[in-house]
Amino acid sequence: MATGQKLMRAIRVFEFGGPEVLKLQSDVAVPIPKDHQVLIKVQACGVNPVDTYIRSGTHNIKPLLPYTPGFDVAGIIEAVGESVSAFKKGDRVFTTRTISGGYAEYALAADHTVYTLPEKLDFKQGAAIGIPYFTAYRALLHSACVKPGESVLVHGASGGVGIAACQIARAYGLKVLGTASTEEGQKIVLENGAHKVFNHKEADYIDKIKKSVGEKGVDVIIEMLANVNLSNDLNLLSHGGRVIVVGSRGTIEINPRDTMTKESSIKGVTLFSSTKEEFQQFAAALQAGMEIGWLRPVIGPQYLLEKATQAHENIIHSSGATGKMILLLN
């Protein structure tokens, strides 16, 4: 390490495993931006379920060890590399991805994954945009190809992606139904775009949804936990309905006939299959939502960097989501 190189605190993962493999280090070198890269002084970083899958080694993304987790940071540009024209030191920004990892005091990011954070949103909200809103937008507009007037059920609507999906769906003229498992979660869902909300812990909640939507069924289901809900989802769909799988934590048995009779479809979505051009399209639509005011991230549990292990335990095992989980750096 060069003499005088600036150091920072960061979470490092030296082996794949449980939350306990997240190690806080205070002697990590601050990265230096290269061509088309920016260095961000991180104020907050989003914690996403995918972070835990990657950490455990069960995800198809397997970073070289050791690595620092974290995709969606919000902060202030500290330095820019060569050929960066869209940003300068001092700009407020958020990201959809980082190069060096977001669970750190500084994060390196490619300039095409960095976006201006409007003054009306604080850094906590900025850290809740990247993965949740871009994923929800891709699921609804790109994968499901929703149309105004259609109905959408957000199955697991009180977390980061769920709230984003409710807000986007309402803004685009859909009839929005959501589910949540706690009273607080249900309140948040109704406050953020849903016309109706159901408690998915109740034994008869599927019957209540069926009664609400009538014989036609639901046009689109945004599914956060497919290994639990997919079979029920197929029975809730309308003719030609679509289930978009955003999250799953295991396997499930389904009856393919349930798709045949309604000519329905199941489609998985992953944000990082998006092209640069698609990211630009998503960003333009979401930036408009920020300006108009319908895009307003809801912040849930907040943890200091040194509590990252607890955050990873809670995001998987909590009784019910209530907004986007974030790590605070400053």
Swiss-Prot record:
PROSITE patterns: QOR_ZETA_CRYSTAL. GO terms for molecular function: DNA binding; identical protein binding; mRNA 3'-UTR binding; NADP binding; NADPH binding; NADPH:quinone reductase activity; zinc ion binding. The keyword NADP applies. It comes from the Eukaryota. Interacts with (AU)-rich elements (ARE) in the 3'-UTR of target mRNA species and enhances their stability. NADPH binding interferes with mRNA binding. Has minimal or no quinone reductase activity. Binds strongly to single-stranded DNA. GO terms for biological process: protein homotetramerization; xenobiotic catabolic process. It is found in: Cytoplasm. Homotetramer. The modification Phosphoserine is found at S248. This is Zeta-crystallin. Keywords: Acetylation, Cytoplasm, DNA-binding, NADP, Phosphoprotein, RNA-binding. Pfam families: ADH_N, ADH_zinc_N. InterPro entries: ADH-like_C (IPR013149), ADH-like_N (IPR013154), GroES-like_sf (IPR011032), NAD(P)-bd_dom_sf (IPR036291), PKS_ER (IPR020843), Quin_OxRdtase/zeta-crystal_CS (IPR002364), Zinc-ADH_QOR/CCCR (IPR051603). NADP(+) binds at Y53, S158, G159, G160, V161, H200, N229, V246, G247, S248, R249, V269, T270, L271. Belongs to the zinc-containing alcohol dehydrogenase family. Quinone oxidoreductase subfamily. The modification N-acetylalanine is found at A2. One of its GO terms (cellular component) is cytosol. CDD domains: zeta_crystallin.
